[in-house]
């Protein structure tokens, strides 16, 4: 389906910065962001799980972005690779309309995703 919302669409793993003694990313994910109709977005899993890869299925809920007071800054709810929710002290930013940064400061981890071009 076509959308005029520049945030909606597919986002693919770009890179990460993390301390593996605090956290290990569960894969090189492809995600879909879909508007929730209230200024936020549902984050849906598409592909790329490495941890418990057989249990992750396309379109499963991977997280949510909730709007904050700053433009392009969101509070983040995340479902980790083992299906555990992470909801405190985490946030997300979208820069240049093309880079989604998920920040987990207490886990010394940042994951970045790039917006995939829309195919017509």
Regions found by a protein language model. Give the residues of each.
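Intrinsically disordered/low-complexity terminal segments and short unstructured peptides
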Residues: 100, 108-109
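Residue-level recognition of beta-strand termini and adjacent short loop/turns
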Residues: 94-98
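Central antiparallel beta-sheet cores of small beta-barrel/beta-sandwich binding domains
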Residues: 5-91, 103-105, 114-116
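Short, low-complexity, Pro/Ser/Thr/Gly-rich segments in the mature regions of secreted, periplasmic
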Residues: 110-120
């Amino acid at each position: 389906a076509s959308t005029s919302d520049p945030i909606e669409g597919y986002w693919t793993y770009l890179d990460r910065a993390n301390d593996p003694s605090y956290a290990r990313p569960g894969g090189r994910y492809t995600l879909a962001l879909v508007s929730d109709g209230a200024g936020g977005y549902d984050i849906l899993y598409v592909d790329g799980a490495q941890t418990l890869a057989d249990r992750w299925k396309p379109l499963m809920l991977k997280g949510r972005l909730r709007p904050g007071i700053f433009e392009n800054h969101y509070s983040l709810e995340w479902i980790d690779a083992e299906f555990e929710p992470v909801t405190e002290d985490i946030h997300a930013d979208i820069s240049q309309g093309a880079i989604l940064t998920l920040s987990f400061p207490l886990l010394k981890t940042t994951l970045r995703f790039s917006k995939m071009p829309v195919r017509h």
